[in-house]
């Protein structure tokens, strides 16, 4: 049932085990061998590439049979590689791809691949896009970059990273543009004596909101050399005020004629906009890929954020027409005669923004054509004081009433009086912040009701009476 071991005779039991204890000096010899102090040494082959395993660990399993070079001072060799940027050339081995792209290798002398001298750093000749990623025309596009706009591999990525849609890289200018004309040196008789600085008026810049010339510019002697100048010269008179500068006109300040508002502006520095402010017309050609699914965002809006790198089809004949509609102050299109956006009416905003095809009214205005004061009323937040002044200037034949809703904390009512008065009543609703009421909450209507002479404003428990 159970296997029995054969009996052992006395001769077999008396035999000693066939092994010898380890020598006490074995550990010391191993340490000396690792340090290269023993009799065994690795072959030095100056013409052959360095042994990668030996350079990394200091030992080599092949010993004298290894066909690579084993320099005695490994630290000096690695320091030389780091300083000179020379990496091992291993003919017959595959080339190091990272070295071919970047010109560097993080493994250094211990890399087991081939590093040709004249082939490293080819990445430096590859053009980069505006985000710093390589542009490789003809290669496959980086899918991660097309989705997120970023690439974790950076400059070492081997795929194509196209420029963003609508982005053009202008060529570098041949020379820096001259924003201000050069000023020539003045002779002592032209400025009437030494001064610590020279005053030169700046030219007008196109599109500025100032009608007069800009303030004078102070030029130090380092910019305009003046013979006989000394830092310890007579004090300079204080700068003229803006009103005094307009009064001076074209008179001479320190021998230099001040430029007036009639001076022609500098061409080419600030180009004027032919289109209205806030309206940007962008012409972009999107790729047509027959056989691919159609870009739904392009079909709805006529635009595509991926541009030429989009992988979907962009049919030109199905582009929605872009109507040149006017945008409201909050950036939503005003389309009179079109159905109102129900989402905007209920929530006060629209998730489609300027691409929405419905109307987003800011308020309705009904007025008598004879009342010219309301003809040019802007669709924007309107100050209460200015609104009262405009209403007061209107003729008495067309009384105007402002009807507002939505506020519950304050209101204003009028008390009717005789017909002989020519005052105008206004029902104003103040918001919590006070000061202005957006036209989206006001409705103007023309009526022939009795004029009002008094008003009462109730706000946060305080009552104020005014008489017009």
From Swiss-Prot:
Against InterPro entries, the record matches this protein to: Plant_ZF_CCCH, Znf_CCCH, Znf_CCCH_sf
Subcellular location, in the record's words? Nucleus
Question: Which cysteines in this chain are paired by disulphide bridges?
Answer: none
Q: Name one GO cellular component term.
A: nucleus
Name the domain of life. Answer: Eukaryota
Q: Which intervals hold the zinc fingers (C3H1-type)? A: 45-73, 90-118, 136-164, 289-317, 335-363
Per UniProt, the keywords (alphabetical) are:
DNA-binding, Metal-binding, Nucleus, Repeat, Zinc, Zinc-finger
Q: This chain belongs to which protein, by name?
A: Zinc finger CCCH domain-containing protein 32
């Amino acid at each position: 049932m159970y296997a029995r071991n054969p009996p052992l005779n006395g001769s077999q039991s008396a035999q000693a085990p066939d092994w010898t204890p380890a020598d006490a000096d074995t550990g010391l010899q191993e340490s000396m061998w690792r340090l290269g102090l023993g009799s065994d040494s690795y072959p030095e082959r100056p013409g052959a590439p360095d042994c990668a395993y030996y350079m990394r660990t200091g030992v080599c399993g092949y010993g004298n049979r290894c066909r690579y070079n084993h320099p005695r001072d490994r630290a000096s060799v690695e320091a030389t590689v780091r300083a000179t940027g020379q990496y091992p050339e291993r003919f017959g081995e595959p080339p190091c791809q990272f070295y071919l792209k970047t010109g560097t290798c993080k493994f250094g002398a211990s890399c087991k691949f081939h590093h040709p001298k004249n082939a490293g750093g080819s990445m430096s000749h590859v053009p980069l896009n505006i985000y710093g990623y390589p542009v490789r025309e003809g290669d496959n596009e980086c899918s991660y970059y097309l989705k997120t706009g970023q690439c974790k591999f950076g400059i070492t990525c081997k795929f194509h990273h196209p420029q963003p849609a609508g982005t053009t890289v202008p060529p570098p200018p041949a020379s820096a543009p001259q924003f201000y004309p050069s000023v020539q040196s003045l002779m002592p008789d032209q400025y009437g004596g030494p001064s610590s600085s020279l005053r030169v008026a700046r030219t007008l810049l196109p599109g500025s909101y100032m009608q007069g010339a800009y303030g004078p510019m102070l030029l130090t002697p380092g910019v305009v050399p003046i013979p006989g100048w000394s830092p310890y010269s007579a004090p300079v008179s204080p700068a003229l005020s803006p009103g005094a500068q307009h009064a001076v006109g074209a008179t001479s300040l320190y021998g230099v004629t001040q430029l007036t508002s009639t001076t022609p502006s500098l061409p080419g520095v600030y180009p004027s906009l032919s289109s209205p402010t806030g309206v940007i017309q962008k012409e972009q050609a999107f790729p047509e890929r027959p056989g691919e699914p159609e870009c739904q965002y392009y079909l709805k809006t006529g635009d595509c954020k991926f541009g030429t790198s989009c992988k979907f089809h962009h049919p030109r004949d199905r582009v929605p027409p872009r109507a040149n509609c006017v945008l409201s102050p909050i950036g939503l299109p005003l389309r009179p005669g079109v159905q109102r956006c129900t989402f905007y009416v209920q929530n006060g905003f629209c998730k489609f923004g300027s691409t929405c095809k419905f109307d987003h009214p800011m308020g309705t205005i009904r007025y008598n054509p004879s009342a010219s004061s309301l003809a040019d009323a802007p669709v924007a937040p309107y100050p209460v004081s200015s609104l009262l002044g405009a209403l007061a200037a209107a003729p008495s034949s067309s009384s105007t009433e402002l009807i507002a809703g939505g506020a519950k904390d304050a209101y204003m009512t009028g008390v009717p009086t005789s017909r002989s008065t020519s005052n105008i009543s206004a029902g104003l609703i103040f918001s919590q912040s006070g000061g202005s009421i957006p036209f989206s909450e006001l409705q103007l209507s023309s009526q022939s009701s009795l004029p009002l002479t008094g008003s009462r404003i109730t706000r946060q428990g305080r009552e104020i009476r005014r008489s017009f």
